[in-house]
Curated annotation (Swiss-Prot):
The EC number(s) this enzyme carries: 3.5.3.1
Cofactor note: Binds 2 manganese ions per subunit.
Gene Ontology CC: one annotated term: nucleus
Family in the record: Belongs to the arginase family.
Assigned keywords, A-Z: Arginine metabolism, Hydrolase, Manganese, Metal-binding
Gene3D superfamilies per the UniProt record, alphabetical: Ureohydrolase domain
Biological process according to GO: arginine catabolic process to ornithine; urea cycle
Protein name as catalogued: Arginase
Subunit structure: Homotrimer; oligomerization is dependent on Mn(2+) binding.
Enzyme class: hydrolase
Binding residues annotated for L-arginine, in chain numbering: N165, S172, D217
Amino acid sequence: MYECIQDYLTNHKDEKNIYVNKCISIVGSPLSAGQSLSGVNKACDNLRKFGLHDVIKAVGWGYEDIGNIGEKIPINGFLKQENIEKENDQINNNNPSYYNNIKNAEVIGKFSEKLFQTMSSELKKKNFILNIGGDHGVAFSSILSMLQTYNNLKVIWIDAHGDINIPETSPSGNYHGMSLAHALGLFKKKVPYFEWSEKLLHLKPENVAIIGIRDIDKYEKIILKKCNINYYTMFDIDKKGIYNIICEALNKIDPNKNSPIHISLDIDSVDSIYAPGTGTIAKGGLNYREIHLLIKSISDTKRVVSMDIVEYNPLLDESDKAVHGDSLPIDPNATKTGKLCLELIARVLGNDIV
């Protein structure tokens, strides 16, 4: 029924990535303004503390740690829902060509521009870009920066949620639930403080596959179908298996099997049994083996050029215990979700069982 995965993936362990050097640019993106919980901005430094650099070296890669992009928090803190229109009316002077219902638009827009500039600069080095969030709002700049260099970029968006609301349909005004729609150019108006991005190349719907969704808002369902986006729910994964799903997804978005690939991994795609440290939990997610096989299968193409890992919230995480199979140099005090994040980073870099 499906093209054999071996026909798509390149399984020679010694073959190099055809697009990037064996060196990683680590970019910390501690954006938290795209959602409402504190703690997600601590993920970058937590992963460093738990052994990020040692893990990268252990799997044979070099790295350059660029540090963290600064998030400028307003004096009065982030906005509550009831104050969104007041803030954005002040920003755009009631200009009808602008949206006025995106929470913390100024903070997010300015942060996103800095992130875009940083990643664009790092791309000149031909390094693999590892973008550690932060909330999933950071993916907008990540994807757009990659697209300006790799205009045929394909995106695998791994998430419990669609993140494809537009401001007209968003029930919360939280940007992290709209970032994919924004990257796809689906917004009908301008966004305050995102003017820098208006003329940039945006992602085409046929070049993205969403995997693992199980918590979709009413209007997101309409948008997904209307835009003919490739998506795979947890029901699809249960019926077909994760192995067949990633094979099908790759063949659909990249039939010529030669394009660079960006992975945008929201850790809430994983079931909370394995990844409790995240703010928007939905029951029935990917299990431990499924997420590892998914990342490994994409990595085996030898064409992954960048990865977001987002929505890890250390303040919500749980302790973990060491087991005999733990072979990576991860701090024994690492919490459950933090440890999984590091394992998946190693996996995308080619770490294998044998």
